[in-house]
Amino acid sequence: MAYPLALRLLEQEGDNGKKICGCVVNLYEKMKAEFPDASLAIDGDYPYGGKAEIKVRSKDDFTVFLRIPHYTAKITLNGRELSCNRGEFLKVINPANEESCLEIFFDLSLKEVSAPGDPAYTAVKRGAVVLAEDSRKKDVPNARVHEEWNGHFLVEYSAAGSCFNKENTLQVFFRA
């Protein structure tokens, strides 16, 4: 059975061979995964929205390791805030025969990132998304992110310059 690339499975040896006992979640895009004795579903609008919700159900204890991005604001388990270290993994155990609801809230404030090798230039990120200025300025069809920064109108990089012609250009780095 194939599982989404966002997941990595954890197995353990049992009396009847290998058994799935957990998973590692690296990305928070909407998905569902069914295992023999558990299920996991992720809902939300990641990477554009500020929250992802993960529901885990299992017949036995089921371990979930969550990658905690640097732009994470907070994480809750069944409404209770958890302590976590950004840039690391958080271990959560779903008890047997229960459903757990994890919510991950992302900080989507704009962050400046210096250009590699030239700190005189800066790119702008919003959570996981790199932003760019499209030569069409505010008229960028299909853009899901619209931000103004230092007089520039920015959209997500994947939408900028999407006309694929000489007149439609994009800019990612700006003089700091």
Regions found by a protein language model. Name each.
Residues 38, 77, 82, 97-103:
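N-terminal and secondary-structure boundary signal
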Residues 72-93, 110-117:
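Solvent-exposed beta-strand/loop surfaces of large extracellular or lumenal domains
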Residues 62-65, 92-108, 113:
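C-terminal beta-strand-rich structural cap/linker in extracellular carbohydrate-active enzymes
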Residues 55, 60-69:
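Surface-exposed beta-strand/loop patches in extracellular or lumenal glycoproteins
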Residues 41-44, 90-94:
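Beta-strand-rich interaction surfaces with strong enrichment in secreted/lumenal proteins
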Residues 1-55, 85, 103-176:
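C-terminal beta-rich recognition modules with glycine/proline-rich loops and embedded aromatic residues
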